[in-house]
């Protein structure tokens, strides 16, 4: 009996991978363009069709580039809080935030900074973080797998729309 060329581990690339090269390249080209035509893609399909694998491959490709920051969020948790925590934990950005005397201690991120007013709204905190990502000429890819219609997703989508309107490099 021969081994099954497919995998039941969601998101893990199977031995027999059905490449979505055209679609993957279209998304990568769009995201990497000087002026992106799209900053959001929703990958849909039937169960087992390779949505998570495709998303993982796109994230992997962008992670290899120095001008990209890639974070993965869990849709069952507070996405804005998780995003702030993940951005804050990136050593290069963490140092930028401390040097800029940004106090995110109200969210359990880092330490209180003397003579700095604490940021008390998570959306404002993320906007400050995104400004520093923009100043450092980087782009931020956020991937969320298995999205459902939940309050966390609706809040995140509303904030994401605001970030897009403010021209932050968020994808």
Annotate each predicted stretch with a short phrase.
Residues 13-17, 73, 115, 157:
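Short, N-terminal intrinsically disordered low-complexity segments that are rich in Pro/Gly
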Residues 23-29, 124-128, 155:
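Well-ordered alpha-helical segments embedded in enzymatic catalytic cores
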Residues 1-41, 89, 139:
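A short, basic N-terminal segment
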Residues 24, 55, 80, 156-157:
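Amphipathic alpha-helical segments in well-structured domains
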Residues 36-151, 168-169:
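P-loop NTPase nucleotide-binding core
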Residues 29, 60, 64, 158-162:
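Short, well-ordered alpha-helices that flank and scaffold nucleotide-derived cofactor binding pockets
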Residues 130, 157-167:
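Conserved catalytic/switch belt of AAA+ P-loop NTPases
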């Amino acid at each position: 009996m021969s081994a099954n060329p497919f995998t039941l581990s969601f998101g893990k690339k199977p031995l027999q991978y059905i490449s979505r090269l055209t679609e993957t390249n279209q998304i990568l080209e769009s995201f990497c363009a000087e002026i992106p035509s799209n900053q959001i893609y929703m990958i849909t399909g039937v169960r087992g069709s390779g949505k998570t694998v495709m998303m993982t491959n796109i994230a992997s490709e962008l992670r290899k580039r120095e001008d990209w920051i890639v974070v993965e969020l869990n849709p069952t948790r507070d996405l804005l809080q998780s995003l702030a925590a993940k951005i804050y934990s990136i050593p290069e950005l963490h140092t930028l935030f401390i040097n800029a005397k940004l106090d995110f201690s109200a969210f359990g991120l880092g330490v209180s900074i003397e003579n700095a007013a604490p940021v008390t709204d998570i959306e404002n905190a993320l906007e400050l973080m995104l400004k520093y990502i923009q100043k450092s000429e980087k782009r931020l890819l956020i991937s969320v797998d298995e999205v459902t219609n939940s309050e966390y997703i609706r809040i995140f989508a509303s904030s994401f729309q605001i970030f897009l309107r403010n021209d932050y490099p968020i994808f």
